[in-house]
Amino acid sequence: MADIRAAVTDTHALLHHAGGRGLGPGAAALFQAAEDRRAVIYVPMAVLWEVTLLARAGKINLRRPAREFFVDLFTNVAYQPYDLTREQIFAADELRFNRDPFDALIVAAAQALALPLITRDTDIVASRALKTIW
């Protein structure tokens, strides 16, 4: 774990981190390294959109608007937003491990960056499409 300096976060991993519980040991160590500015965690645009939709639907409580949540998150330079590209959309369209479009876009972002994905999503892990951390 100590040698990993950068990764991409899945939505549930970021929400577990924000809630202060529920992360696996590898994920917790990586988020702590980011908090200490010893690692970089990329946050795909698909994660921002999914969190915003979940908050609007009342499925999660960020205790503030999603915009403020992400503005606060990105004040730490170790958290970097990662833009969606058309190539990622095409790559995501070719992924068939589940029917969740957010998962496909997030995996495509991690693949584009050639970085591991912080996730415990069983479909993603089982797909072996990329290295995962939990």
Residue ranges and their predicted role:
Residues 1-43, 57-72, 113, 123, ...:
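Short, well-structured N-terminal submotif of metal-dependent ribonuclease cores
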Residues 34-37, 48, 68, 82, ...:
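Generic hydrophobic-segment detector
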